[in-house]
């Protein structure tokens, strides 16, 4: 007749009753069925209080001389398996410890001037235990700057506070991580979406009810005065991102959902994209190179505002390195032409070139860099190039080169 013996993994644990065979033995397979990896049993001797092992022969556990009795038997494990189990427990404990997120300082924006640190602490204490609050003040006047900092004990409290807007002393305030806490290389995954094309009859409660079908809505904000848009903040950033770009129907009106990205992030993206423009004298629509007195060559959509009659090359893309190389090449090539013209002028009767044809006087068109002040005194239609502070007038001849030695200016007469 079989009986049940009490077996446990540790002496202090609650035992499990395991059935024995008809001959009074216990199969090791019966033990391993309840304690995987077990290789034997042991028990504490009531007389000596020492641990004794149970005899094991070919997978069969034999009862002690006095029988199984009411003793509690402890399971034995191989040492290697026990070591592995201990290491697994230790590694899992380390992983759990690393998974615990630490809290950090949160910046509170839009604080009323009258709000004190005590007011701030009392408000945020309703969410959880507050470690620190601080209202930034002007060193000279001692007045509030309109923002402060707060830190909580629990990370869950921090997440909850960041997921919603806060009415503090009659004013809406935002609480978020400072910019220094966010990596610029990581993409910003916002939980807030922009809802465009809203109508005045849409209320915050209606928007909250509508968007609740997609996920938990933490906050709904409609700016006042009404400007035909609203902001909806979800608890999960993945839900917010999945709705971006969608056109949804609310109360029979089509609204467009997009990412509510802060302005400073948009500016950062424009800076990283390498675009030039928007500044006087730069690339783009606000002027260009060559705003000099001698007439410059403008890049982009310039309106020809140079004093010397600058010419535009159209709206094409060019970088500063290319422009500098082009200017250097032009100065070098035209300088060589000027030297050739000077040599020809020195071989003339008096160094003064006369126009050999009956050419009509026409205004010059000049390309220049620096403070060139060419005057239109060339005989014939001349396109003059000059550099440095030339103050004279270059005399050209038909189909050749012309130069004035007195003013050290050179021109190409055409």
Curated annotation (Swiss-Prot):
User: Which superkingdom, per the lineage?
Assistant: Eukaryota
The record, for PROSITE patterns, names: RRM (PS50102)
- Look up what happens after changing residue 267 to S: In ALS10; also in a patient with frontotemporal dementia
Ranges of residues in domain RRM: 104-200, 191-262
Q: What's any one GO cellular component for it?
A: mitochondrion
| Principal cellular location given in the protein's record | nucleus
Where in or outside the cell is it found?
A: Nucleus; Cytoplasm; Cytoplasm, Stress granule; Mitochondrion
Give all Omega-N-methylarginine modified positions: 293
Which GO terms of the molecular function aspect are on file?
DNA binding; double-stranded DNA binding; identical protein binding; lipid binding; molecular condensate scaffold activity; mRNA 3'-UTR binding; pre-mRNA intronic binding; RNA binding
Q: Where is this region: Interaction with UBQLN2?
A: 216-414
A single GO BP = regulation of circadian rhythm
Per UniProt, the keywords (alphabetical) are: Amyotrophic lateral sclerosis, Biological rhythms, Cytoplasm, Disease variant, DNA-binding, Isopeptide bond, Methylation, Mitochondrion, mRNA processing, mRNA splicing, Neurodegeneration, Nucleus, Phosphoprotein, Repeat, Repressor, RNA-binding, Transcription, Transcription regulation, Ubl conjugation
Q: What about PTM?
A: Hyperphosphorylated in hippocampus, neocortex, and spinal cord from individuals affected with ALS and FTLDU. Phosphorylated upon cellular stress. Ubiquitinated in hippocampus, neocortex, and spinal cord from individuals affected with ALS and FTLDU.
Q: Which disease is it linked to?
A: Amyotrophic lateral sclerosis 10: A neurodegenerative disorder affecting upper motor neurons in the brain and lower motor neurons in the brain stem and spinal cord, resulting in fatal paralysis. Sensory abnormalities are absent. The pathologic hallmarks of the disease include pallor of the corticospinal tract due to loss of motor neurons, presence of ubiquitin-positive inclusions within surviving motor neurons, and deposition of pathologic aggregates. The etiology of amyotrophic lateral sclerosis is likely to be multifactorial, involving both genetic and environmental factors.
- Domain-related comment: Consists of an N-terminal domain (NTD) and two tandem RNA recognition motifs, RRM1 and RRM2, followed by a C-terminal glycine-rich region. Contains a nuclear localization sequence and is mostly nuclear; however, its nuclear export sequence permits it to transport mRNAs to the cytoplasm and even to synapses as part of neuronal granules.
Q: According to its UniProt entry, what is the function of this protein?
A: RNA-binding protein that is involved in various steps of RNA biogenesis and processing. Preferentially binds, via its two RNA recognition motifs RRM1 and RRM2, to GU-repeats on RNA molecules predominantly localized within long introns and in the 3'UTR of mRNAs. In turn, regulates the splicing of many non-coding and protein-coding RNAs including proteins involved in neuronal survival, as well as mRNAs that encode proteins relevant for neurodegenerative diseases. Plays a role in maintaining mitochondrial homeostasis by regulating the processing of mitochondrial transcripts.
Descriptive protein name: TAR DNA-binding protein 43
| Species for this entry | Homo sapiens (Human)
Q: What is the lineage of its organism?
A: Eukaryota, Metazoa, Chordata, Craniata, Vertebrata
């Amino acid at each position: 007749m079989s009986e049940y013996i009490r077996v446990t993994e540790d002496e202090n644990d609650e035992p499990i009753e395991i059935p024995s065979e008809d001959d009074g033995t216990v199969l090791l397979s019966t033990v391993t069925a309840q304690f995987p990896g077990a290789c034997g049993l042991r028990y504490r001797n009531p007389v000596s209080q020492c641990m004794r092992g149970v005899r094991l022969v070919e997978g069969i556990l034999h009862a002690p001389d006095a029988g199984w009795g009411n003793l509690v038997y402890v399971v034995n494990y191989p040492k290697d398996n026990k070591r592995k189990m201990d290491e697994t427990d230790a590694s899992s404990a380390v992983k759990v410890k690393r998974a615990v997120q630490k809290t950090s300082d949160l910046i509170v924006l839009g604080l009323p001037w009258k709000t004190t640190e005590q007011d701030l602490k009392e408000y945020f204490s309703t969410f959880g235990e507050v470690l620190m609050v601080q209202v930034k003040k002007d060193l000279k006047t001692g007045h509030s700057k309109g923002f402060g900092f707060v830190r909580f004990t629990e990370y869950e409290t921090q997440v909850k506070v960041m997921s919603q807007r806060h009415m503090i002393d009659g004013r809406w305030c935002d609480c978020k991580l400072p910019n220094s806490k966010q990596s610029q290389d990581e993409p910003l995954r916002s939980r807030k979406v922009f809802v465009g094309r809203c109508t005045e009859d849409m209320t915050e409660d209606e928007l909250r009810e509508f968007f609740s079908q997609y996920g938990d809505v933490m906050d709904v904000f409609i700016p006042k005065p009404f400007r035909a848009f609203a902001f909806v903040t979800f608890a999960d950033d993945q839900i917010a991102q999945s709705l971006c770009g969608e056109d949804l129907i609310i109360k029979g009106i089509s609204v467009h959902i997009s990412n509510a990205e802060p302005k400073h992030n948009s500016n950062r993206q424009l800076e990283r994209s390498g675009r030039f423009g928007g500044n006087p004298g730069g690339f783009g629509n606000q002027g260009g190179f060559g705003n000099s007195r001698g007439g410059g060559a403008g890049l982009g959509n310039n309106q020809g505002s140079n004093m010397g009659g600058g010419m535009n090359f159209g709206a094409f893309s060019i970088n500063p390195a290319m422009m500098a190389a082009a200017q250097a090449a032009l100065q070098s090539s035209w300088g060589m032409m000027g030297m050739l013209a000077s040599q020809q002028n020195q071989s003339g009767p008096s160094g003064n070139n006369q126009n050999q044809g009956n050419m009509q006087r026409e205004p010059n068109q000049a390309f220049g860099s620096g403070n060139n002040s060419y005057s239109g005194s060339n005989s014939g239609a001349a396109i003059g190039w000059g550099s440095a502070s030339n103050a004279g007038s270059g005399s050209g001849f038909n189909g050749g080169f012309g130069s004035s030695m007195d003013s050290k200016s050179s021109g190409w007469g055409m």
